[in-house]
Amino acid sequence: MSNDDQLKVRQTVSKKKSFKELTIVRDIIFWIDLVGEGQNENAIFARPFNEKEAFPQKLTSKKYNIKNNFHGYGGKSYKCIYLKNNFYLIWIDQITNAVWFQIFKEVASNYRSQKRYLDSVQEPRQLSKSIDGNFDSSFVISQKNFLYGICEINNRDYLFSLNLKKTKQDIYRIKKFKNFAGELSSNTSVSLLSWVEWDSPYMPWEKNDLCFAQIDLDGEITKIKKFSDKLINAK
């Protein structure tokens, strides 16, 4: 949990309030905002969804540049997953060029102060070593404490995993994609992964293939299948 409580939050003093990279998990809103005066200093904030006048709680310190450069055009730079009664906050940091995460628990409503809605269960951890490439933020966490994601290294996309119990680890490359990939997702039990693949000159919203794969007990993927429907895939 950050102790930089005195840092100015620009969003709170702006006449026109806006949220950047908005996420809603349960009754908590998460977003990104600048801190300090530098354009490369930002943090993740949170507040209750139904309390518009609640003062934002800053969840990450100013030492991160939370940004997504995946495939050159980026996207959302963090993800929050509610798992095992906790909030798993995962973000991409451009200073270390690595994946970080922190675990929070929700403060009971009758104990919430004006500025505190989530308590840190675990201090921030740098999950991955720095990579010469970019991460996507469509992360998935399994019940076995593995994080799955997609990254690009040397202009090739990979499905990878990280052990949530370890720090500063090499990414474990599970699959090398033939073309571009993104939008990683899973079913509730995280026994099935899905993602989309596409090839140039198309963008993913123009033409793509939806793929599925099962995850075995060791975290490896098996039985990769491409979704096929003559009507949907028709040119």
Predicted regions and their residues:
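Blade/loop signatures of beta-propeller domains
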Residues: M1-D5, Y158
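Beta-strand-rich domains and repeat architectures in extracellular enzymes and scaffolds
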Residues: D4-A46, K76-S77
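Conserved beta-strand position repeated once per blade in WD40 beta-propeller domains
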Residues: E21, S77, S137-F139, E183
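Residue-level detector of Asp-centered blade-edge/turn motifs that repeat once per structural unit
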Residues: I24-R26, I81-N85, S142-K144, T188-S189
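A flexible loop/linker signature enriched in serine peptidases of the S9 family
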Residues: D33-F45, K63-G75, K84, I90-W100, ...
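Short loop/turn segments that connect beta-strands within beta-propeller blades
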Residues: P48-K52, F104-V107, N163-T167, I215-G219
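Blade-edge beta-strand/turn elements of extracellular beta-propeller
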Residues: K168-K175, E220-K230
